[in-house]
Amino acid sequence: MSEIASRVKAIIVDKLGVEESEVTNEASFTNDLGADSLDTVELIMEFEKEFGISIPDDQAEKIGTVGDAVSYIEEHAK
């Protein structure tokens, strides 16, 4: 697992209060991890802060799974 993936998963565990074992690349923030729309906005904001990136709203809407988040951040992180 990449450093970015590890950091993304740690943020999700912290923010959503889920078990690390639940946070798989295929896990949907809403369907599998119980996040609501506010939770997902907060996750995106935390990813932006942690990785020093900006995620436009139109891109944030496409980030629905843990794997989506990791892929986006790996592409855009400095």
From Swiss-Prot:
GO terms for molecular function: acyl binding; acyl carrier activity; phosphopantetheine binding. GO terms for biological process: lipid A biosynthetic process. Pathway: Lipid metabolism; fatty acid biosynthesis. The keyword Lipid metabolism applies. GO terms for cellular component: cytosol; membrane. Keywords: Cytoplasm, Fatty acid biosynthesis, Fatty acid metabolism, Lipid biosynthesis, Lipid metabolism, Phosphopantetheine, Phosphoprotein. Coiled coil: none annotated. The modification O-(pantetheine 4'-phosphoryl)serine is found at residue 37. It is found in: Cytoplasm. NCBIfam families: acyl_carrier, PRK00982.1-2, PRK00982.1-3, PRK00982.1-4, PRK00982.1-5. HAMAP family: Acyl_carrier (MF_01217). Carrier of the growing fatty acid chain in fatty acid biosynthesis. PANTHER family: ACYL CARRIER PROTEIN, CARRIER DOMAIN-CONTAINING PROTEIN. This is Acyl carrier protein. It comes from Bacteroides thetaiotaomicron (strain ATCC 29148 / DSM 2079 / JCM 5827 / CCUG 10774 / NCTC 10582 / VPI-5482 / E50). The gene is acpP.
